[in-house]
A protein has these predicted regions:
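C-terminal substrate-binding/active-site "lid" region of AdoMet-derived donor-dependent transferases
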Residues: 98-131
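Conserved class I S-adenosyl-L-methionine
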Residues: 31-41
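Conserved alpha-helix/loop element of class I SAM-dependent methyltransferases that forms part
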Residues: 13-33
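Class I SAM-dependent transferase core
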Residues: 1-18
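A short glycine-rich, Lys/Arg-flanked "PGG" loop and its adjoining helix->strand segment in the class I
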Residues: 84-98
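A short, well-structured beta->alpha microelement
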Residues: 53-65
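Conserved SAM-binding loop of SAM-dependent methyltransferases across substrates and taxa
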Residues: 42-52
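A short acidic, Gly/Pro-enriched loop at the edge of an enzyme's catalytic core
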Residues: 64-74
Length: 132
């Protein structure tokens, strides 16, 4: 019988906790699908689809992709209870994840949103969250 090692819950400082709470609040206020983007230096990466109950990260491409390396991961995330796992996955596999974009009710993020001004943004360390 194979036993799986239980992963320790990550420890976050106050800024990280506040940031995760802000992201959760924004997701809980949204209706329908949203698009999450992880990118570096204004280069858009893959799309991530979410609703107020959960998120499926189709392809997680971290900043290592833009520095000659490449990392890809598929994972199911329960946004309400487990959204911080996205940050933990990013921390484990890349030195920096620069930007997370959230665009409500849009499947394809138009090029005009690359570097576009946003209505709301919160940040913690290397992470930024934008609500257009």
């Amino acid at each position: 019988m194979k036993f799986f090692k239980k992963k320790k819950k990550p420890v976050y400082d106050t800024a990280d906790q506040s940031f995760v709470a802000s992201v959760l609040d924004a997701l809980n206020l949204s209706h329908g699908d949203a698009v999450l983007e992880i990118s570096k230096d204004s280069v858009l990466a893959e799309k991530y689809f979410a609703n107020r109950y959960g998120a499926y990260v189709k392809q997680l491409k971290t900043a290592s992709e833009f520095t000659g390396g490449f990392f890809e991961l598929s994972v199911m995330i329960d946004v309400v209870s487990d959204f911080e796992n996205l940050f933990e996955i990013a921390r484990e596999n890349s030195e920096q994840v620069a930007v997370i974009y959230l665009k409500k009710c849009v499947e394809e993020l138009p090029p005009k949103f690359c570097g576009a001004p946003c209505k709301t943004s919160v940040s913690s360390g290397n992470y930024k969250f934008f609500l257009f």
